[in-house]
Amino acid sequence: MSQVMSSPLLAGGHAVSLAPCDEPRRTLHPAPSPSLPPQCSYYTTEGWGAQALMAPVPCMGPPGRLQQAPQVEAKATCFLPSPGEKALGTPEDLDSYIDFSLESLNQMILELDPTFQLLPPGTGGSQAELAQSTMSMRKKEESEALDIKYIEVTSARSRCHDGPQHCSSPSVTPPFGSLRSGGLLLSRDVPRETRSSSESLIFSGNQGRGHQRPLPPSEGLSPRPPNSPSISIPCMGSKASSPHGLGSPLVASPRLEKRLGGLAPQRGSRISVLSASPVSDVSYMFGSSQSLLHSSNSSHQSSSRSLESPANSSSSLHSLGSVSLCTRPSDFQAPRNPTLTMGQPRTPHSPPLAKEHASSCPPSITNSMVDIPIVLINGCPEPGSSPPQRTPGHQNSVQPGAASPSNPCPATRSNSQTLSDAPFTTCPEGPARDMQPTMKFVMDTSKYWFKPNITREQAIELLRKEEPGAFVIRDSSSYRGSFGLALKVQEVPASAQSRPGEDSNDLIRHFLIESSAKGVHLKGADEEPYFGSLSAFVCQHSIMALALPCKLTIPQRELGGADGASDSTDSPASCQKKSAGCHTLYLSSVSVETLTGALAVQKAISTTFERDILPTPTVVHFKVTEQGITLTDVQRKVFFRRHYPLTTLRFCGMDPEQRKWQKYCKPSWIFGFVAKSQTEPQENVCHLFAEYDMVQPASQVIGLVTALLQDAERM
């Protein structure tokens, strides 16, 4: 016949089964601690049982050491039969089981552990000290096969004094023993809406070695165990009546936090313990690095802060929202001891609290208990939960004082609040990011860098006195529909060849921006992407040079100190520093022998109209500079490029008879210039043109050529 002995020697009233060898062995599920409320009961897969009842079940495993050892002398306690069975034994039989001397107890200890050293007589050691040491060794042995996950949840209606760091609330002592997998300690006869005074959630499993440590005899003799620091779990399902909306504490032993440096590599394992009772020294912590609320140094700081107030029975640092969301900037700093966080990822804050219990307790548990965020089942996160990810905006700094008592973190306002609502305040990434131009700024300053009507020489003149990076974009004279980019660089490449009349030390480089259905693209640069507009092209190249020799500098004023598009012919000096250009229709070239002036232009136009077949016009770019006139065939049909030096020019003007050329059913003015023949030095050739676009009138180029010829005659 098996008997049950419950003794204070077993640290908190844990039950042990002593079975004779001639009878079938029976083991009992552990009874809850006497500190639990009377309405609590223990639920297993076999059904509900009263709190005080112990139901024997068959034990299939090998007998434990305590079952084979002699009985222990202790105070007799009451024995509770299971329902439907009679009381086991008589008082005389019970006395025979527990009536042992001190020598018998010492003999039993030596059989359990031959290395155990007995206390000498007369040192004041008591029988309780020896029994406590025996129990410590027993707990150490059982920790190899027992893994209990215990979550202690207390009500939000806790007594708070002097802010959130001094919150005391009733605690629940976890039962010790081998619980069945899936065992759940719930409260009955209490509505689910109000069931938040003191509740516990227990998960048991045999998945690895626990982190239990034997209790030293000195600590076991203390009349009252030390206060355990705690980390609060917010009661999301109920309204908090405390001033700061504190949740229930998640208790952890101080001795565990001292060992965090040694246990840090084990956080990634499946061993998961969550709480510790003041009665027993079973310390718990999270078993997955993805669910850690703090790093090791943060836990050490919280432990030191909690030990400063020993008057409270269960100190609470902050609520979960304050811990995970309102983290101080010091928590993001690297720990002083590198071994505390070695072998595990750093998790500055907890994962977000998702809606519909996506990353919290299962619905069956949540319906009967408060919402516990990020519950780990057997040390692993729930399916669907992802590790916390920090956005780049949150990596720089956090506003100090976000978790001050006067401004508590609003993490416990609603069940569906996530980290996106947390009061994170990000600092700008630096002056470099603030100075990066925006599309609006680029478009607003386009009047300074986009000059469609200027020529290549004008662009060079505008950028000659500017700093490296200055640029200007104009319409390309060689490729119709494309754009020319003039950019001032710091040094001229060795392969660059100087154009006629240009300085070899010129720092202005020219690039072609092609335009197509895909967008604008820098010609010859395959690594360059296509941009939807010139503004996008300029904005991107002002941030990153890409294929250009340097980044573009957005101008905020007129380049060259004046409006380079104005082509005034008031003085010869101003004409020498300017150039003009436009698109025109090239008609033909007619030899006028020795004629010059307006008569030569009149004769050439008359000869052209007298032909049976009129010439086919070609679009060319007419450019006038100090060096002369340069013609560029846009379509490359008649010629590629022709240059007429200023010394060969004789006259440039409109038709004296003001005749017009019919272009696409629209008349356009005809003009021409007279130059020496390149084959016959004694003859002159008149080159005829017609205006191509009303926006680009021929009067500008005609006036500039006339002014240049006048200056050449004076010289």
From Swiss-Prot:
PANTHER family: TENSIN, TENSIN-4. Residues 159-183, 195-251, 291-364, 376-435 are annotated as: Disordered. InterPro entries: PH-like_dom_sf, PTB, PTB/PI_dom, SH2, SH2_dom_sf, Tensin_PTB, Tensin_PTEN_phosphatase. It is found in: Cell junction, Focal adhesion; Cytoplasm, Cytoskeleton. Changing R474A: Abolishes interaction with DLC1. Abolishes interaction with CBL following EGF stimulation. Loss of ability to reduce ubiquitination of activated EGFR. Residues 449-556 form the SH2 domain. Keywords: Actin-binding, Cell junction, Cytoplasm, Cytoskeleton, Phosphoprotein, SH2 domain, Signal. Expression is up-regulated in tumors from a variety of tissues including lung, breast, colon, pancreas, stomach and ovary but is down-regulated in prostate cancer. In colorectal cancer cells, induces epithelial-mesenchymal transition (EMT) accompanied by down-regulation of CDH1/E-cadherin protein levels and increased cell migration. Contributes to cell motility in colorectal cancer cells by promoting EMT through its role in the post-transcriptional stabilization of SNAIL in an SH2-dependent manner which leads to increased cell migration. Expressed at low levels in colon (at protein level). Expressed in prostate and placenta. Changing R650A: Abolishes interaction with ITGB1. Does not affect interaction with CBL following EGF stimulation. Gene3D superfamilies: Pleckstrin-homology domain (PH domain)/Phosphotyrosine-binding domain (PTB) (2.30.29.30), SH2 domain (3.30.505.10). One of its GO terms (cellular component) is cytoskeleton. Residues 1-18 form the signal peptide. This is Tensin-4. One of its GO terms (molecular function) is actin binding. The record marks D570, S571 as: Cleavage. GO terms for biological process: protein localization. Promotes EGF-induced cell migration by displacing tensin TNS3 from the cytoplasmic tail of integrin ITGB1 which results in dissociation of TNS3 from focal adhesions, disassembly of actin stress fibers and initiation of cell migration. Suppresses ligand-induced degradation of EGFR by reducing EGFR ubiquitination in the presence of EGF. Increases MET protein stability by inhibiting MET endocytosis and subsequent lysosomal degradation which leads to increased cell survival, proliferation and migration. Changing D506A: No effect on cleavage by caspase-3. Belongs to the PTEN phosphatase protein family. It comes from Homo sapiens (Human). Interacts (via SH2 domain) with Rho GTPase-activating protein DLC1 (via C-terminus); the interaction is independent of DLC1 tyrosine phosphorylation. Interacts with integrin ITGB1; the interaction displaces tensin TNS3 from the ITGB1 cytoplasmic tail and promotes ITGB1 stability. Interacts (via SH2 domain) with E3 ubiquitin-protein ligase CBL (phosphorylated on 'Tyr-774'); the interaction is enhanced in the presence of EGF and reduces interaction of CBL with EGFR. Residues 197-206 have a biased composition (Polar residues). Induction: By EGF. Residues 291-325 have a biased composition (Low complexity). Proteolytically cleaved by caspase-3 during apoptosis. Residues 582-705 form the PTB domain.
